[in-house]
Design a protein with these regions (language model features):
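A cross-kingdom feature that marks ATP-driven nucleic-acid transaction machinery
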Residues: 1-22, 27, 50, 59-60, ...
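Interdomain motor-coupling "hinge/lid" segment immediately C-terminal to the ATP-binding subdomain
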Residues: 4, 8-9, 158-265, 269, ...
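Pre-Walker A adenine-sensing motif
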Residues: 24-41
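Conserved glycine(s) of the Walker
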Residues: 56
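Conserved catalytic segments around the Walker B and adjacent sensor/switch elements
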Residues: 70-85
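Short glycine-rich substrate-engagement loop in P-loop NTPases that contacts/grips substrate
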Residues: 81-113
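Conserved catalytic/switch belt of AAA+ P-loop NTPases
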Residues: 130-146
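Structural recognition of the conserved hydrophobic beta-strand(s) that form the central parallel beta-sheet
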Residues: 144-150, 171
Length: 452
C-alpha cells in the first residue's frame, strides 16, 4: 500500500493519538442538523450528508466523531478521511483506506457490540463510489458509514439506484437565525410555534434587545458559519461569491452537468436574486439573458438541485394546476442575494423586505412543505403551510406600520379555505386584530424565525 496514503490516513485522524479529531473542537456551536447525524449512528444504513457549499458539513462530521468519543467509543474505531487531495480518483483508493483502517487500526476488528465508524468526506471525487459503499454495506455489517461531499449535487446524483434503501440523506443547511445567534454567543430559550402558542418564555426578555439588533445583520449576511463575525460586509460578499457561487457554478456543476455557458447561469442567478420572493415566468426571464426558455428551465432545475435556489408553488389541490400556474423564486440563503446584488445593513426597506420574506420561507420550508397562494382575482398570500386541521396562511409585511388592508389576501384565503386564523409577520409589531370571524395574529419576524 502507498506509504503516502498511509501517512495521510494517520495525519487525518489525530484522535488515534489522544488529540481531538479537529482543531477548535471546544468552540463548535451545537446545531440541530448536526445533532441529527448522531441519532443515526446506531442504524444499519449509510448516512449521506448533503447541504449547500460552506454550510458546515465537515464541521458536522467532526462534531459527530467527537460525540462518539464522548459516548465512550474507542478513538481507533473512528476514521475520518477526505478524498479531495488524493492523487488517484480510482475506486481502489477508497478500498485501500477502508482496508487499512479495519485491518491495522480497529482493535480486534469491528463487531456488533463494538462497530467501526467511517467518515468519508469529498466522496464524489472517487470513481464509482456508490458501488464501493454498497459493497461495504453488504459485506461489513459492523461498519457504519457516513459520507459527504462539498458538491451535494454530485453526491446526490451519484447515489442513484445503488444505495436505494441502503442510505439516509441528511441535509445540513446554512445557519438558522437561532443558530446564528448561538454563534454570536446569544442563547435563546425554546419558543413554541406561534400557531400553537403565541407566548414567549419570560427569560427571552433578557436577550430580546440583542436578538432584534442582530436580525438585520442575519438577513444581510445570511447563514454561512464562517461569515458570522466577518467584517466588513464587502468581505462577506467576496467570500460568498468566491467560495460558494463561483465554486458551484464554475466548478462543481461542470463536473456533473452539461452546461454550455456557466456565465449565463450566473447571470440567471443574479436575476433570481433580484426577484427572490416574487412570482416569475421562465419565458419572461430567458430573453433577458439571451437564452432559450428550454435552456433556462434546465438551468433552473440544476440550480435547485445544487441547493442555490428553490421554486415555490401555488397552493392548490390540483397538482396539474400547480405545475402550470406561476411560481415564486427563492434563493436558498439571504447571503446569496446580498452577495449578488451588493446589499448591506443600510439597504432600503424594499430590499430588506425581500430578504425578510426569503428568510421566513427558507426557515419554514426546512420542516414543512411551503407554498404561496394567488387566486384569479390577484389576491395573494406569501406563505401557506399545509396542516391537518386547516392550512396556515402567513403574510409578510416587513414594516413598522400595519393596516387592515395588509391582511386582505389573508382574509380572502381564509374565506376560500375555511380558516379562522391567519398570521401577519411584521418588522416589530405584535398583537392581534379580528376581521369578521377571522383572527389575524400579528408577530415580529424574529418570533417566526426563532420558533422550534
Amino acid at each position: 500500500m502507498d506509504e503516502r496514503l498511509v501517512r495521510q490516513i494517520v495525519i487525518s485522524n489525530p484522535q488515534w493519538s489522544g488529540r481531538p479529531p479537529a482543531e477548535h473542537m471546544d468552540v463548535i456551536v451545537p446545531r440541530d442538523s448536526i445533532a441529527e447525524l448522531l441519532s443515526y449512528a446506531d442504524d444499519r444504513q449509510i448516512v449521506i450528508v448533503t447541504g449547500p457549499r460552506r454550510s458546515g458539513k465537515t464541521t458536522g462530521i467532526m462534531s459527530t466523531i467527537q460525540q462518539l468519543l464522548d459516548r465512550g467509543v474507542d478513538p481507533k474505531r473512528t476514521l475520518y478521511f477526505s478524498f479531495d487531495e488524493v492523487l488517484s480518483r480510482e475506486h481502489t483508493v477508497l478500498e485501500d483506506v477502508v482496508s487499512y483502517f479495519i485491518q491495522n487500526v480497529v482493535p480486534e476488528g469491528a463487531t456488533k457490540k463494538a462497530p467501526a465508524f467511517l467518515f468519508l468526506d469529498e466522496i464524489q471525487f472517487i470513481k464509482d463510489w456508490p458501488t464501493i459503499l454498497k459493497r461495504i454495506y453488504e459485506t461489513r455489517a459492523n461498519v457504519k458509514v457516513f459520507a459527504s461531499g462539498s458538491s451535494s449535487l454530485g453526491v446526490r446524483k451519484g447515489m442513484g439506484e445503488s444505495l436505494a434503501g441502503r442510505a439516509f440523506d441528511i441535509t445540513i443547511p446554512t445557519l438558522s437565525f437561532r443558530e446564528y445567534l448561538a454563534f454570536k454567543g446569544i442563547e435563546v430559550p425554546k419558543i413554541p410555534p406561534v400557531w400553537s402558542d403565541t407566548k414567549v418564555p419570560e427569560s427571552f426578555m433578557l436577550v430580546q434587545n440583542e436578538v432584534t439588533n442582530a436580525l438585520t445583520s442575519y438577513l444581510v449576511r445570511g447563514g454561512y458559519p464562517e461569515t458570522v463575525d466577518m467584517r466588513p460586509i464587502s468581505k462577506v460578499h467576496r467570500y460568498i461569491q468566491q467560495s460558494v457561487l463561483d465554486r458551484v457554478v464554475y466548478h462543481d456543476l461542470l463536473e456533473t452537468e452539461s452546461i454550455a455557458n456557466p456565465a449565463s447561469m450566473m447571470h440567471l442567478l443574479k436575476i433570481l436574486a433580484s426577484m427572490s420572493s416574487q412570482r416569475f415566468e421562465i419565458a419572461n426571464i430567458a430573453p433577458d439573458i439571451g437564452m432559450k426558455a428550454q435552456t433556462a428551465s434546465k438551468y433552473l432545475s440544476i440550480l435547485e438541485r445544487a441547493m442555490l435556489f428553490s421554486t415555490c408553488y401555488n397552493y392548490t389541490k390540483s397538482q396539474v394546476k400547480q405545475a402550470r400556474s406561476s411560481k415564486r423564486a427563492y434563493l436558498a440563503d439571504t447571503g446569496l442575494i446580498s452577495a449578488l446584488l451588493g446589499l448591506d445593513e443600510t439597504t432600503g426597506s424594499q430590499e430588506l423586505g425581500r430578504l425578510a420574506e426569503t428568510a421566513a420561507y427558507n426557515h419554514l420550508s426546512r420542516t414543512s412543505p411551503a407554498f404561496f397562494w394567488r387566486d384569479p382575482q390577484g389576491n395573494e398570500v406569501d406563505i401557506v403551510l399545509p396542516s391537518k386541521r386547516a392550512p396556515i396562511p402567513i403574510e409578510l409585511k416587513y414594516q413598522t406600520s400595519i393596516y387592515k388592508s395588509d391582511a386582505k389576501g389573508l382574509v380572502r384565503f381564509c374565506d376560500v379555505h375555511g380558516c379562522d386564523k391567519a398570521f401577519l409577520v411584521t418588522k416589530d409589531k405584535e398583537g392581534a386584530m379580528n376581521i369578521g370571524d377571522i383572527e389575524i395574529i400579528i408577530l415580529p419576524l424574529w418570533r417566526l424565525l426563532l420558533q422550534t
